[in-house]
Amino acid sequence: MAIHINIIGAGNMAYQLTQAFHNHPEVQLQQLYNRSELSPEFNVFEIEKIHHLSTLRPADVCIIAVKDEAIAEISKKLPFENQLVVHTSGNTSIEAIDSKNRRGVFYPLQTMNKQTLVDFTKVPFCLEAENTNDFHLLQRLASLLSTKIYALNSYQRRVLHLAAVFINNFSNHLVYISEQICKENEVPFEILQPLLTETFTKLQNTSAYDAQTGPARRNDSLTIGNHLAMLDNNNYKEIYEIITNSIINTYGRKEL
């Protein structure tokens, strides 16, 4: 029997989940809600699209895929009770959902946008529910997309989200800084692409502690000093110093 779901939201998460579920033979995607008009990317989905929460019908799972700060308000306005309502946030407690409904979390841990389709077979799903039957339903729903399924409570999920920010968001910003340094000095950034690939490929099989290399790992003060002298951007210089000192401290050396 198909799992009937509704999706609330029109951002990257809502788009990717809609894309994954809308033609799945074991899922009936009933309704897609957003307060305002949906972006053109959603036009390809032959689903009932609504703009008033009062017209949202009950479903086996109602997925709230919106910004963290909007979860509580939307959950209070849902026009039904005692239904399974979940959010998709890594950083928000299950208790953000109004208690008039059965609460849960359906969190796929992956960076998302509307330009690149997510291969959910490679994505871990972190699940939480207040009762066993609801957890099993979320487990079944997640298993339609992935075999990587984890039961995490709200605190564990927030810890995971924090760690993910370091891996994904901060590392991406460091790559951006590298791009800017190359651009400002007319050096082709493409030269660094193989290094970028190797850095993250190596971490699939080696701990970050063991994989660390570079001047800070060697405590090469001459190279570090030369790099700092080359950085005219004070923000970049501060980031370089903070990360360098963190690496030095990690391996038991004295700070700069």
Residue ranges and their predicted role:
Residues 17, 40, 102, 117-159, ...:
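Internal alpha-helical scaffold of NAD(P)-dependent oxidoreductase catalytic cores
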Residues 199-256:
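Interdomain hinge/lid region at the active-site interface
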Residues 15, 19-23, 76, 229, ...:
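Short, well-ordered alpha-helices that flank and scaffold nucleotide-derived cofactor binding pockets
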Residues 1-53:
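NAD(P)+-binding Rossmann beta1-loop-alpha1 motif at the extreme N-terminus of oxidoreductases
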Residues 63, 164-167, 171, 240, ...:
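Amphipathic, non-transmembrane alpha-helical scaffold segments
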Residues 17, 35-117:
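Rossmann-like NAD(P)(H) cofactor-binding subdomain of soluble oxidoreductases
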